[in-house]
């Protein structure tokens, strides 16, 4: 049986947590930041968790995570 390839784009974006979830970076924090409030930018700063609905897709991309 051949090895399953990891989707490298996903490997760079998601990190597995100890409880089996996946950490991710919030969107909307790369450019066009002047019109966004300081509060909004601050709330986007910490890592988020992947939704339960999307976990299966991430696991399929990261077979060895």
From Swiss-Prot:
It comes from the Bacteria. GO terms for cellular component: cytosolic large ribosomal subunit. Keywords: Ribonucleoprotein, Ribosomal protein. GO terms for molecular function: structural constituent of ribosome. One of its GO terms (biological process) is translation. InterPro entries: Ribosomal_bL35 (IPR001706), Ribosomal_bL35-like (IPR021137), Ribosomal_bL35_CS (IPR018265), Ribosomal_bL35_sf (IPR037229). The keyword rRNA-binding does not apply. Gene3D superfamilies: 4.10.410.60. Pfam families: Ribosomal_L35p (PF01632). Belongs to the bacterial ribosomal protein bL35 family. This is Large ribosomal subunit protein bL35. It comes from Hamiltonella defensa subsp. Acyrthosiphon pisum (strain 5AT). The gene is rpmI.
């Amino acid at each position: 049986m051949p090895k399953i390839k990891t989707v490298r784009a996903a490997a760079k974006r998601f990190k597995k947590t100890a409880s089996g979830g996946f950490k991710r970076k919030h969107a909307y924090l790369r450019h066009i930041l002047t019109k966004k409030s300081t509060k909004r930018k601050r709330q986007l700063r910490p890592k988020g968790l992947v939704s339960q609905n999307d976990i299966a897709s991430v696991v399929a991309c990261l077979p060895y995570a």
